């Protein structure tokens, strides 16, 4: 569409003035924006990366992961840290719950010697630390565990039983306004872990809500609802959890997808089990009876032995992972891998200010 010559000159002058005053790149045509292709970090789960559409969690954005107790929230974030560290990225863990287990983190592949960790006294201190790390431009991934544990200073200094209506919500709202722009400029991923509460007096719809007010819901580019849906057993011994993650909000790809995977105790996400299942589903791995074969070579009798083969041959696992990602990401076939989530399952869609 042609623009009037006088308007073009006026626009060019205005753009020149803006760039002179605020710096080059402060305004541009959208097609010229080099940051349109979103950089991502793997979640540690192939099926969840596919459900997210972009191949993982987006850098420069805010992400919220919420769910019931012992559902795998912290485990999932530690897997994200391990994946980021494998790409030589700097990570920080803001442990507001004072419950991070370094031994468990190390078992999941986290390099604890190079993981920055803070155990703040107040919510304001935790969020200020987040902002300082972000503005440094040197930290790539920040985890806050958890929003519910970000206690305002006034509440800590007050008496038990005092009313502090909306304090946490106001604190989070102010922090989101300040952090969002800094995260984008620094290309830092900020993940908030959140807990679930029940709304009183709800007769219809979902009574669940998350803590910390509504601001986090609006500013988050991705919201993940994680639930434990069953147990993984070896004989009578429970060795892990069957886990389902629903993508209830997604600003970088299609939302309302879900993924299921196993979290093994002491090991984390069973990525090799995912590779076997997805490989069979998409005909990269052949299954004849109980035998699994890859590229015409038998890799094991039974899923457990096939997983052991992939563990002993990481180059084969990496090759299979690459083939599946190339095949499924950004494709209709990939979208069919995960199912849509009903809108009523958006869960924790509203927050009460008092939480």
Swiss-Prot record:
Name this polypeptide is given: Protein RecA
Keyword DNA-binding appears in the UniProt entry: yes
Gene Ontology CC terms: cytosol
Reported function: Can catalyze the hydrolysis of ATP in the presence of single-stranded DNA, the ATP-dependent uptake of single-stranded DNA by duplex DNA, and the ATP-dependent hybridization of homologous single-stranded DNAs. It interacts with LexA causing its activation and leading to its autocatalytic cleavage.
Comp. bias regions, Acidic residues: 341-355
UniProt-annotated location(s): Cytoplasm
Pfam families: RecA, RecA_C
Disulfide-bonded cysteines: none
Family per similarity comment: Belongs to the RecA family.
PANTHER family attached to this UniProt entry: MITOCHONDRIAL DNA REPAIR PROTEIN RECA HOMOLOG-RELATED, RECA
Chief location category: cytoplasm
UniProt cross-references to CDD domains, sorted A to Z: RecA
GO molecular function: ATP binding; ATP hydrolysis activity; ATP-dependent DNA damage sensor activity; damaged DNA binding; single-stranded DNA binding
Coiled coil: none
SUPFAM superfamilies per record: P-loop containing nucleoside triphosphate hydrolases, RecA protein, C-terminal domain
GO BP field: DNA recombination; DNA repair; SOS response
Alphabetical keyword list: ATP-binding, Cytoplasm, DNA damage, DNA recombination, DNA repair, DNA-binding, Nucleotide-binding, SOS response
InterPro entries: AAA+_ATPase, DNA_recomb/repair_RecA, DNA_recomb/repair_RecA_CS, P-loop_NTPase, RecA-like_C, RecA-like_N, RecA_ATP-bd, RecA_C_sf
Keyword Nucleotide-binding attributed: yes
Positions with a binding annotation for ATP: 67-74
Region spans: Disordered: 335-355
């Amino acid at each position: 569409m042609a623009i009037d010559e006088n308007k073009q000159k006026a626009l060019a002058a205005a753009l020149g003035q803006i760039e002179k005053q605020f710096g080059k790149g402060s305004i541009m045509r959208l097609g010229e924006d080099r940051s349109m292709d979103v950089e991502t970090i793997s979640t540690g789960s192939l099926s969840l990366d596919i459900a997210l559409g972009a191949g993982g969690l987006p850098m420069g954005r805010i992400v919220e992961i919420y769910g019931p107790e012992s559902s795998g929230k912290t485990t999932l974030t530690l897997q994200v840290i391990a994946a980021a560290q494998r790409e030589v990225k700097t990570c920080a863990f803001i442990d507001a719950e004072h419950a991070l287990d370094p031994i468990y983190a190390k078992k999941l592949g986290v390099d604890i010697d190079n993981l920055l960790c803070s155990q703040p006294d107040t919510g304001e201190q935790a969020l200020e630390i987040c902002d300082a790390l972000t503005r440094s431009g040197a930290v790539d991934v920040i985890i806050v565990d958890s929003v519910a544990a970000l206690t305002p200073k006034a509440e800590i200094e007050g008496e038990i039983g005092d009313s502090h209506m909306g304090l946490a919500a106001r604190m989070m709202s102010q922090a989101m306004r300040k952090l969002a722009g800094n995260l984008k400029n620094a290309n830092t991923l900020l993940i908030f872990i959140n807990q679930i509460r029940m709304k009183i007096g709800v007769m219809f719809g979902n009574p669940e809500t998350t803590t910390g007010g509504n601001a986090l819901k609006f500013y988050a580019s991705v919201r993940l609802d994680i639930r434990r849906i069953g147990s993984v057993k070896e004989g009578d011994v429970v060795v892990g959890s069957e886990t389902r993650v629903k993508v209830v909000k997604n600003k970088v790809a299609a939302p309302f997808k879900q993924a299921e995977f196993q979290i093994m105790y002491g090991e984390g996400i069973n990525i090799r089990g995912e590779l076997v299942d997805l490989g069979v589903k998409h005909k990269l791995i052949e299954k004849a009876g109980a035998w699994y074969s890859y590229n015409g070579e038998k890799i094991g009798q039974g899923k457990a032995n096939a997983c052991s083969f992939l563990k002993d041959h990481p180059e084969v696992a990496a090759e299979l992972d690459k083939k599946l990602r190339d095949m499924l990401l950004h494709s209709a076939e990939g979208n069919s891998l995960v199912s849509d989530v009903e809108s009523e399952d958006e869960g924790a869609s509203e927050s009460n200010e008092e939480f």
